[in-house]
Amino acid sequence: MKDFPIAISLLFALLSPVLLPCSGDSTGGVEDDSPATVCIVGSGIGGSSVAHFLRNYSVSTGLNQAKILMFERHEIVGGRMRTVTVAGDTFEAGGSILHPKNYHVKDFVERFNLTVRLPTPIEESSAIGIWDGKRFVVKTFGSGTKFPFLDTIVSWVNDLYLFLRYGLSLLRMSSFIENTVDNFLKYYESLESRPIFDNVEGMLKWSGLYNLTKLTLQEKLSEAQLSPLLVNELVTVITRINYGQSVLISGLAGAVSLAGSGGGLWSVEGGNWQMAAKLINHSDVTLHLNEKIESISYLENHYELKSTKGNSYKCDVTVVATPLDEVDIQFSPTISIPKRELQHTHTTFVRGLLNPGYFGMKSLSDVPALVGTLEDPLIPFSCISILRKYSKTDMTYKIFTRQPASDSLLDELFSRRTETVRIDWGAYPKYHAPEVFAPFILDDHHLYYVNAFENAASTMETSAVAGENIARLIISRFMTKESLSSSDKRSCSSGLHSDS
């Protein structure tokens, strides 16, 4: 959901239990020579990544001929990666931005020759305002002139303005983000040095990220000696935009949110959902669209999946790659996972013209292109941003709210509306500290849960990282007589693989 162009890249320099080795012992497995059937529930980046890595990592194992069935309850693939069309233009409505060090999704884009979309000049040069409900407590200058020298001067002025307001806390925040990113990069190390994890806690402890889930972002930033002013203003704006929540989210989710607001951000031209579509198409998957799985039952040595279409499927391995928090799937035997709520973000796209009077301004040019807000229940929106300018009186905007945006609110915010599109997303978990995690393995057999990792952080890349681990976990546990050979491990060593 993180799509708002945030022109604050100038602030950032950048943004253990070892359980099962790649050649580890296996449990359960194939008892005959027939190909195994792997069923994946959910076609988002998590589920499609599992399919992709299963195909790439099981070349010389008994799973290399596995049949992969994928079930998607909607009519298109992509999960929470969706686009919306407003007045003929396509915009990201779900998972929207990618970090320059999101190496799995970068590999997907390069592998399938997808086109990278970089921020437009208006996005990179947009002025930012922080609204407290009555006035702008922070307001930077926009650039984007035809003269690069003038743009540089404006950037320096904004630098100085923010430094005078927040001081050395800006540098401490940059260091906090960089340390988190460096730890996350351990998930791309060679497979020889990177274990397979059967629980989220072990995965986070190994990378040095677990302690960030034990305290809130506010507490972690206080430990890092950031000023309360910076936390209550700029950091709050970022967490409200990227996760729809306050600085009381867990420290790890907050750090990921901050990293998603720096420079070098990008997306896929035409929609990020294309990554999932390409992964599925190139992984020899039998795709069942518009088919909702309503029950998953373990029957002696296999799973039976039943759908709302009345169909039944026999599966040796089942992977749940959709949040179980708002999906009604009956499990037999029952499973036990911690209760978790999803944070709903209401996204509204409006083509029209913002009302400067709402912000106490006489001219629209006085209103920043991105308006973020402080944590105040009386403020009815999290942020408003210009997505596209057609003319001085005709633009497309994107608004995030925690509650549905009523017509009366939109009529206050806009002087004119020609088109309005509303979307309600169960976007990501409601983060707390300390976090409690569901297991990757939901039973004693082969029922796996990709979205257990979402309680650490929810992004397209973290879903791909979790999907890769699940694929390795399936291979290591499923095989009774075989394990990944040395040659296989060498072919996997980069974590980013070429099709065979």
UniProtKB/Swiss-Prot annotation:
Chief place where the protein resides: other
Entry's EC annotation: 1.8.3.6
Any GO MF annotation of the entry: farnesylcysteine lyase activity
Entry's Gene Ontology BP terms: abscisic acid-activated signaling pathway; farnesyl diphosphate metabolic process; prenylated protein catabolic process; prenylcysteine catabolic process
Domain of life assignment: Eukaryota
Keywords (A to Z) from UniProt: FAD, Flavoprotein, Glycoprotein, Lysosome, Oxidoreductase, Signal
Catalyzed reaction equations: S-(2E,6E)-farnesyl-L-cysteine + O2 + H2O = (2E,6E)-farnesal + L-cysteine + H2O2
Subcellular location: Lysosome
Protein name as catalogued: Farnesylcysteine lyase
Native organism: Arabidopsis thaliana
UniProt lineage: Eukaryota, Viridiplantae, Streptophyta, Embryophyta, Tracheophyta
Gene designation per UniProt: FCLY
